[in-house]
């Protein structure tokens, strides 16, 4: 019998379940636990290989006869906002992004609950309680931050703090970028395009920190839920041969970038 080292990650495969993105298909995932002193290094390595983090689990799709889920990362220092993106930035000029430690609050959960009720009422997270939310935020063995997006107040120029909470992003800090784990916003503020704004803000943050990439998770061609990720260009998409550069929708480099 072979005895595995405690430092050697063990990988497991889930049973098939209905795909939440492509009707009529089933999904499977391969996953491992992110624990111990080297959890951050392992998360870095696995993210580069197309994994995503959820609490202390790193996973990626391992579906039979389907490779629709494609990992996407934006090239931060080459990104130039389009006219539409500049409009989103201008529309949210009254918003301050405040980075904090990964500590959940009742104020965050209130926005999270409203977001789920309005946009994901029948999804897998619909029944999450305040304790479930706290676990989602706190159960991390890697470098994780909360970014709160608030409206500017009369004293914001002095204190650097905003007032009403509008949106929240749970973000991992990797050796080569920022990975957006989960984000949500107040549904009454839908006209602000906060989902887009948070990605634009993360691209700007990565650039300021000298980090080359912003990881957006999976893009799925043909899924309306995932179409928005293709708009942030240039970007790289993970293929069997490595990360391929995309400069325009539908275009890909013929050689891996890394």
Curated annotation (Swiss-Prot):
Keyword annotations of the record: Acyltransferase, Cytoplasm, Transferase
GO CC aspect terms: cytoplasm
InterPro entries assigned to the protein according to its UniProt record, in alphabetical order: Acyl_CoA_acyltransferase (IPR016181), Asp_Glu_LeuTrfase (IPR017138), N-end_Aminoacyl_Trfase (IPR030700), N-end_Aminoacyl_Trfase_C (IPR007472), N-end_Aminoacyl_Trfase_N (IPR007471)
Taxonomic superkingdom: Bacteria
Subcellular location: Cytoplasm
EC number: 2.3.2.29
Pfam family, one: ATE_N
Name this protein carries in UniProt: Aspartate/glutamate leucyltransferase
Annotated source species: Bradyrhizobium diazoefficiens (strain JCM 10833 / BCRC 13528 / IAM 13628 / NBRC 14792 / USDA 110)
